[in-house]
Amino acid sequence: MPPLAVLLLALALLCAWRLSYSQGPTGTGTGRPRSLPALPLVGSLLQLAGHPQLHLRLWRLQGRYGSLYGLWMGSHYVVVVNSYQHAREVLLKKGKAFAGRPRTVTTDLLSRGGKDIAFASYGPLWKFQRKLVHAALSMFGEGSVALEKIICREAASLCETLGAAQDMALDMAPELTRAVTNVVCSLCFNSSYRRGDPEFEAMLEYSQGIVDTVAKESLVDIFPWLQIFPNRDLALLKRCLKVRDQLLQQKFTEHKEAFCGDTVRDLMDALLQVRLNAENNSPLEPGLELTDDHLLMTVGDIFGAGVETTTTVLKWAVLYLLHYPEVQKKIQEEMDQKIGLARHPHLSDRPLLPYLEATISEGLRIRPVSPLLIPHVSLADTSIGEYSIPKGARVVINLWSVHHDEKEWDKPEEFNPGRFLDEQGQHIHSPSPSYLPFGAGIRVCLGEVLAKMELFLFLAWVLQRFTLECPQDQPLPSLEGKFGVVLQVQKFRVKARLREAWRGEMVR
C-alpha cells in the first residue's frame, strides 16, 4: 500500500476511535455537550461547508444543539460557546484552565512558533512577557499625553484630506487605514508616513495579504500533512510574512544600535528598557529569557492587530452613521453644546460627550470586530456549566451570538446608542454582562485602551467639522459584513460635507 494511503487510513482510524471515545452522555449531567454529526477524517466539516459567514452558522446551530455544543474539525474537538454565562466562565471564572492556544501551521508562521502574546502557549514565559509588555505600554503608550498628541495629529491630517475632497464621493477606507497605521507606527517605531511612501505601501500590502490569506481558514490548519502539496495561499502568506519580518528586523536593528536607556522614544525602546531592567534587577529563572524574536513578535502583534481592528471599527462606525443620520446629528449637537467650535476635542472631553461614547459602544456591540474570538484551549480536564470538557479541547467563543442575545438585548439588530446611557444620559460602560467587545480575563485584548482613544478622537474630530452623507446617486451601503480575521465592511463611498457652523468659524 502506498505511504500516503497508509497515512490516510491511519488518520481515519484515529478519528473514528476519537469520535467513538467522545460519545456517551451528551446533553445532561457530567457528559460532554451535544455534538454535531461527524465523519471519520473530516469530522463535522460537512456541516459547516457552504457557509462563508461562519459566525452566523454557529449562531444558528444553537437552535438545534443548545447554546453550548461540540463539533469536530478533522481530529480536533471544538466546543462552541454562544451564551455570555458560559463565555464569562471560560474567560474569567476559569481563565487559567482555558488559557491555552491551539498550535496551527498558520499561527506558528505568524508568531515564529508562538513567540508573541496572542498565540503563545500559556505558561511562566508568557506571563513574564505579558508583564513586560504592560510595563512598556505604561512607560510609553496607554493614556499618555504624547500618544494623545500623535492621534490628534493624525486626526487633523484626516480632516485635511476630507476637507480637500468635500462634496466628492470618497472611499474613506484608505485614509482611515493610513491614519491608524501612522498612530501605531509612531507608537511602535517613532515614525509616520505620507501617502505613497514605499515603506508605508509595503506595510499595507503585506498586512492585507496576511488578512486575506488567514481569513480563508486554510485546511492545512486542520490537516497539517497537506503542507506536502502545493498551496497558493500558504505561499502568499509566507511571502507577506517575509516582507513583514524584513521591515520589523530593520526597525529593531536601528533601535538596538541607537538604544542608550536614557531616552525612551517609542514602544520598541520601552520593550528594550524593561527587558534590560528585568535582567539587571535579578537573575532570570531558567526558561524566562526573552529573545529578540519575542520582542519582534510582540511588536508585530501590536502593529498587526492594532491597525486592522481599529480601522475596521471606524469603518463600521462611519457606515452606521450613514444609515442613522439622526444619531450623527445628536452627536454633533452634543459636541456643539459641550465643546463648541473654538477648540479641538481632547481625551479629557470624554465625560462631556456621553452620546458619542455610547455610539462607539453600540458599534462595538452590533458589529463585533472579531465575531469569533481567537480560540482557547483547555489545559486540563475541566467543565463549562454542567458539561465536561476534556484537556486539549479548543473553545470558540461566538461573540456575535453573545452580543445579539435577545434575552440580554432588546431588538439586538437595531442600532441604538441609548442602550449605553443611564436615565441621566450618562454613558454606561457595560449595561449587560453580555458585552465583551475586547474579550476578558487573562487573554483580554492588549490594545483596548489605545483602540478606545483612537475611536473617540478620530470620530470627535471628524464629526465636529463634517457631516457624513451617502452620495445622492448611490444606495445606502450594505450592513452585511464579510467573515474573516475581522468582520470586514463591504466597500462604500461617503461624502464629507463641511458643516456650516464650522465653515463660519473658519471665515472668522
From Swiss-Prot:
Keywords: Heme, Iron, Lipid metabolism, Lyase, Membrane, Metal-binding, Monooxygenase, Oxidoreductase, Steroidogenesis. Heme binds at C445. The keyword Amino-acid biosynthesis does not apply. This is Steroid 17-alpha-hydroxylase/17,20 lyase. Its cofactor is heme. One of its GO terms (molecular function) is lyase activity. It is an enzyme of class 1 (oxidoreductase). One of its GO terms (biological process) is progesterone metabolic process. The keyword Lipid metabolism applies. GO terms for cellular component: membrane. Belongs to the cytochrome P450 family. It catalyses: a C21-steroid + reduced [NADPH--hemoprotein reductase] + O2 = a 17alpha-hydroxy-C21-steroid + oxidized [NADPH--hemoprotein reductase] + H2O + H(+); 17alpha-hydroxyprogesterone + reduced [NADPH--hemoprotein reductase] + O2 = androst-4-ene-3,17-dione + acetate + oxidized [NADPH--hemoprotein reductase] + H2O + 2 H(+); 17alpha-hydroxypregnenolone + reduced [NADPH--hemoprotein reductase] + O2 = 3beta-hydroxyandrost-5-en-17-one + acetate + oxidized [NADPH--hemoprotein reductase] + H2O + 2 H(+). It holds the Pfam family p450. Pathway: Lipid metabolism; steroid biosynthesis. It is found in: Membrane. Conversion of pregnenolone and progesterone to their 17-alpha-hydroxylated products and subsequently to dehydroepiandrosterone (DHEA) and androstenedione. Catalyzes both the 17-alpha-hydroxylation and the 17,20-lyase reaction. It comes from Gallus gallus (Chicken).
